[in-house]
């Protein structure tokens, strides 16, 4: 009887195909629902004192939205960790259209549900995939991480609901 050897590469392919691990479950795309009784008009939420520091801490990495001199992800600057953030510039960028869904502004003052920013932060941007460039609205933000805690997102939501002022 003649024995044949299999190449190590083929052995790895066969072993990988025979493992019992199942592929990761697909991410569910569900609409964010604001908890009943949530007051978006109180307490007052200011952009410079509450929202900008949150963006700098959560989004202001140089590889994401934190480098004022370089092209940032989605072309959006949200303040850098190693600089004094330009709040006026940050707000101006938030009032522009999304690069993934150009028909939708990032922020609609007074209406948090109508802007793309809260969709990305809440993780329900995937409901808009058919309208986005390339038929995908990309990842939730922050990218490759869990969603920000609901109470952190509520700060941004309140600021938008209260008019998205530069205060």
Give the role of each language-model region.
Residues 1-46, 157-167:
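Post-cleavage N-terminal segment of exported redox proteins
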Residues 20-44, 48, 52-150:
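Solvent-exposed helix-loop boundary motif
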């Amino acid at each position: 009887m003649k024995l044949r050897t299999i190449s190590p590469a083929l052995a790895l392919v066969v072993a990988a195909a025979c493992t019992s691990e199942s592929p990761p479950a697909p991410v569910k795309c569900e609409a964010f629902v604001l908890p009943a009784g949530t007051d978006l008009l109180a307490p007052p939420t200011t952009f410079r004192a509450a929202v900008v520091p949150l963006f700098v801490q959560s989004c202001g990495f140089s590889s994401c939205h934190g480098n004022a001199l370089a092209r940032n992800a989605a072309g959006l600057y949200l303040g850098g960790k190693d600089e004094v953030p330009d709040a006026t510039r940050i707000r101006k960028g938030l009032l522009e259209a999304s690069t993934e869904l150009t028909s939708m502004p990032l922020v609609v003052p007074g209406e948090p549900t109508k802007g793309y920013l809260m969709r990305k932060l809440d993780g329900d941007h995937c409901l808009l995939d058919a309208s986005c460039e390339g038929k995908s609205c990309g990842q939730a933000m922050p990218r490759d991480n869990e969603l920000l805690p609901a109470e952190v997102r509520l700060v941004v939501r309140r600021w938008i609901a209260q008019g998205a002022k530069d205060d």
